A protein has these predicted regions:
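N-terminal cap/lid segment of alpha/beta-hydrolase-fold proteins
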Residues: 206-251, 503-504
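Alpha/beta-hydrolase active-site loop
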Residues: 269, 302-323
Length: 507
């Protein structure tokens, strides 16, 4: 199955703060990123790891990512402990490993291998290079795995984390994922490590220890659980599931999937909508689109309309596997750009039983024709020429051009639409969130070829609701979609509202 984890995920089968720190330490050490490693080593000490535990993680890693990386990481830890001691911080030293009472570590290592793997170590390469078998048994699984200041579960967690950020080690990674599971690491925890790894490779924060706050006031009566699942392109999606008050896993609930605006993440208005609908008794799922936020997908910041449509169906897949979800009552709310993507998804996936869009954008039409269909043929050709030239540059240098829909500073000649978006996306008291990092400029060509309403009549007889602000610059997208859709359908115009007013209560 493409679904990574079909079990209800909760705090008991996600990584603890200490485990998150160990995974992050292992990743940064393997990558040789000493600046980030120093930060996460300090965080690990602050959340209860001992100096001995951190030393042991870094010592073991020499076997998996090389002596120079291990040595460099240990130097970083050594200097950090000196700095913290000078600041009066008393870090717990932790205990040293117990002595190993054996003169034949090759035998001990073989015994440890059997316990660790659940089977004898196999592989033609061990016959081809018997010295490797000798070193693995006597040293790695003998000397190192006999050191009892880290348990084997933690050692395998560290190993999986390190291998997950290295290139060319897929077979070894899969082998150690199996070893980790054999030693008590859950599939949900593996998925969390792999999401952290994707973020590590792309210079993003790694874990909930670094979690930026949501842009809205959270409701303590609503339980939120982070979940991970794959779409059909094998991209790992990260979502947050909002559970209604007095949630009972033995019941069957209607569910709503909430898609965020184009140029946004799940911690903004889609999360707010998810929370509000959970208050009304639904199980809701707010996800990050492929290539954005905490979701996977490389190269980062790509916009692939097909993937963004697929994300909705993948979310249906995952929800439909939960025992507390009624498969015949799964609906979608698409906000802004996700409105267009969700229309396309509902046209193609009859499992989506109802659809609502809010301040919908047809990103294909907006990119092809400009807002208000104001783009000339000459301007369109010029944009495609710019995209083509940028592709040459990226092919030559590998450096992407990243485009933000909202400028960092508002110019004096900014129009009303730019001011409206700026007041939300660049306002730290309203909608700004650091997890959104823009899109690739070259993605505009793919968007031009996106026609989300091509099969909109196929949504019928399932109901569709289009919601738009009375004064929204985007209102015509909803009106045109309403005209093209078949019954049952409804167009609701919110009096006095503009486009962004429907994102949050501050509008």
């Amino acid at each position: 199955s493409d679904v990574c984890s079909s079990d209800l995920q909760n705090k008991d089968n996600m990584l603890s703060k200490k485990e998150q720190s160990i995974a992050a330490i292992s990743m940064y050490a393997a990558r040789g990123n000493q600046d980030s490693l120093k930060v996460i080593l300090a965080r690990g000490l602050d959340c209860g790891l001992t100096v001995s535990e951190e030393k042991e993680v870094l010592t073991q890693l020499y076997a998996y990512c090389g002596f120079p990386r291990s040595m460099g990481a240990l130097v970083t830890l050594m200097n950090l402990t000196k700095e913290r001691a000078a600041q009066g911080i008393k870090d717990e030293a932790g205990r040293e490993p117990s002595p190993v009472k054996s003169s034949d570590m090759f035998v001990v290592g073989g015994q440890n291998q059997l316990k660790l793997f659940g089977r004898p170590a196999l592989g033609e390469v061990l016959t081809f290079a018997p010295a490797l078998d000798q070193f693995l048994k006597a040293h790695l699984f003998g000397d190192i795995f006999s050191r009892d200041n880290l348990d084997w579960r933690t050692r395998e967690l560290s190993t999986v984390a390190a291998l997950s950020v290295l290139d060319g080690v897929k077979n070894e990674l899969n082998t150690h994922i199996a070893h980790a599971k054999h030693n008590g690491v859950t599939q949900a925890q593996i998925d969390e490590v792999l999401i952290m790894a994707a973020r590590c490779r792309n210079g993003m924060v790694l874990s909930e220890s670094d979690e930026p706050a949501k842009t809205f006031q959270t409701d303590p009566t609503i339980t939120v659980r982070k979940v991970f699942y794959k779409n059909r392109y094998d991209i790992m999606l990260c979502a947050e599931m909002y559970l209604p008050k007095d949630f009972n896993e033995a019941q069957h609930y209607a569910a709503l999937i909430i898609g965020h605006p184009f140029g946004a993440v799940k911690e903004q208005c889609s999360g707010l909508y998810a929370q509000e609908m959970a208050r009304r008794g639904y199980v809701t799922l707010a996800f990050d689109a492929s290539y954005q936020g905490e979701s996977g997908g490389e190269p980062r910041h790509t916009v692939s309309p097909d993937a963004l449509v697929e994300d909705f169906s993948a979310s249906v897949d995952w929800l439909g596997l939960q025992p507390f979800i009624d498969r015949n009552r799964i609906g979608v709310i698409g906000i802004c750009g996700s409105g267009g993507f969700s229309v396309c998804a509902a046209s193609l996936d009859p499992r989506i039983k109802a659809l609502a869009t809010v301040s919908m954008y047809d990103m294909g039409r907006a990119t092809r024709n400009g807002l208000g269909d104001s783009m000339t043929d000459e301007q369109r050709r010029k944009l495609l020429d710019e995209v083509a030239e940028q592709r040459w540059k990226e092919a030559e240098t590998g450096e992407a051009r990243i485009r933000f829909g909202t400028p960092e500073k508002l110019l004096g000649n900014a129009n009303a639409v730019q001011k409206e978006f700026f007041d939300y996306y660049r306002n730290p008291l309203r909608g700004y969130h650091p997890r959104y990092q823009g899109i690739r400029f070259t993605s505009q060509a793919a968007l031009m070829n996106f026609y989300p309403f091509a099969m909109i009549k196929e949504i019928s007889p399932r109901p569709v609701l289009f919601i738009a602000g009375e004064h929204a610059h985007s209102r015509y997208f909803s009106e045109d979609a309403y005209q093209e859709a078949s019954e049952p359908k409804e167009l609701y115009i919110v009096p006095g509202a503009n486009h962004v007013d429907l994102y949050d209560p501050d509008g």
